[in-house]
Structures are given as structure tokens and as C-alpha cells.
Amino acid sequence: MIQQESRLRVADNTGAREILCIRVLGGSGRRYASIGDVIVATVKDAIPGAGVKKGDVVKAVVVRTAKEKRRPDGSYIRFDENAAVIIKDGGDPRGTRIFGPVGRELRDKRFMKIISLAPEVL
């Protein structure tokens, strides 16, 4: 469950290490984001000389949340951390690698490129 001011780890190789959620996209009253939701964020920590710099405003899709997510079959999925992947306006990832597992909900939201790059889909 991601909301404004939530900090997330970046799970790709764009050079950003940590981002801070500015806005959850999807309507004016939308308060929380879960796996597969798109957020607007700012880069809080980045590797020097990388593609993104500290202070850049980016779009990202949430790939892992510490808050459990209920699946249609009644099972629950949760991760140890909150993590996101920085994306372009078209929905494709800006990086070329994804680190760590991602949720199966990304397939339902049509983020196929992220699914194909991920080492594990849970």
C-alpha cells in the first residue's frame, strides 16, 4: 500500500536507488497504490553518472509491496520491501534489467516487458 511520501526501492538498473511517491495516478481521490499501479515519483538517491539524477520527476510502476495483496483465488502475496520500476510514458521500462521478483498482477495490467525482464514472477 503506497501513498504520498512513501519511499520505494528501485528494482532496475536506471541508476536510481530510492524514489519518493509524489502522486498515485488514477483519479483525483486515489489514495493508495498496490502492485501494478503507476505512480509519479521523485528520485531521492541515485548513482553518480547514471541515466536519472537526484531530483528528477519520473513515472514508476509498483512491483513489490510489504502490504499483502489478496488474489482472486483467495491467496495472499506480500514481499519484504516496497519496490518500483521506472517507466517511460509508453509503459516500457527505462532500464534494461529488473532485480528481484515481481508480482503476477503486472501481467493483468499489461506490463509485459517488465514481466519478460524479471528473473521471477510470483
Swiss-Prot record:
Listed A to Z, the keywords are: Ribonucleoprotein, Ribosomal protein, RNA-binding, rRNA-binding
**SMART domains registered for this protein in UniProt:** Ribosomal_L14
- CDD domains assigned to the protein according to its UniProt record, in alphabetical order: Ribosomal_uL14 (cd00337)
Matching entries from SUPFAM superfamilies are given as:
Ribosomal protein L14
User: What Gene3D superfamilies has UniProt attached to this entry?
Assistant: Ribosomal protein L14
Q: Name the HAMAP family on file.
A: Ribosomal_uL14
Subunit organization: Part of the 50S ribosomal subunit. Forms a cluster with proteins L3 and L19. In the 70S ribosome, L14 and L19 interact and together make contacts with the 16S rRNA in bridges B5 and B8.
Which NCBIfam families does the UniProt record give? rplN_bact
PANTHER family, alphabetized: 50S/60S RIBOSOMAL PROTEIN L14/L23, LARGE RIBOSOMAL SUBUNIT PROTEIN UL14M
**Family listed:** Belongs to the universal ribosomal protein uL14 family.
Functional note = Binds to 23S rRNA. Forms part of two intersubunit bridges in the 70S ribosome.
The protein depicted here goes by the name Large ribosomal subunit protein uL14
Q: Which organism is it from?
A: Salinispora tropica (strain ATCC BAA-916 / DSM 44818 / JCM 13857 / NBRC 105044 / CNB-440)
Taxonomy, top ranks, is:
Bacteria, Bacillati, Actinomycetota, Actinomycetes, Micromonosporales
